Amino acid sequence: KLGTKAVASAEVELVDAEGFLLAPSGADGDGGGAGDGRGLARMMEMTNGARLGIAMMGLGCARRALVESLCYAQAREAFGAELVHHPLMQRKLAELIVEVEAAQALVFDGYLGPRLRLGAPLIKLRAARLGITAASDAIEIHGGNGYIEQWPVARILRDAQVNTVWEGPDNILCLDVRRAIERD
């Protein structure tokens, strides 16, 4: 597989498996349960919780890409000075810092704030995309070294790619957002 090589992957086939209701009668304290019509809503709540987890993974890729970029830019010299002292590099690093900090605020608000119907898909979409762009920027900052397997930024980019797929690719998230807007 392309990335997340430290995570085991396998195909599972369930044959003659039993299914269980998400909430048996009265389990959630509201008297609801089998036949209460909230099965899909409960499943979407679980999916949105998982989407926030994927958003955290995208944020983690972005933050690691930022840290690797900052360390490299401080250590690497070009044209008589460390990369971090060149104005265009300062701008790129500053933009990356702003994007990572903004995504972190979104992800943390998603966990701590009220659960908005649109929150989880939007946060996941933004953070997962940022993981890829930050890793790509890190490769650019590292120059030719960024393309070499021995440097961590190549792995970060490979690992970040899957976050846009897990728990709903971009087009599904956009459909969820559109449906929620139409309902509201």
Sequence positions of predicted segments:
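Internal glycine-rich alpha/beta core junctions
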Residues: 1-184
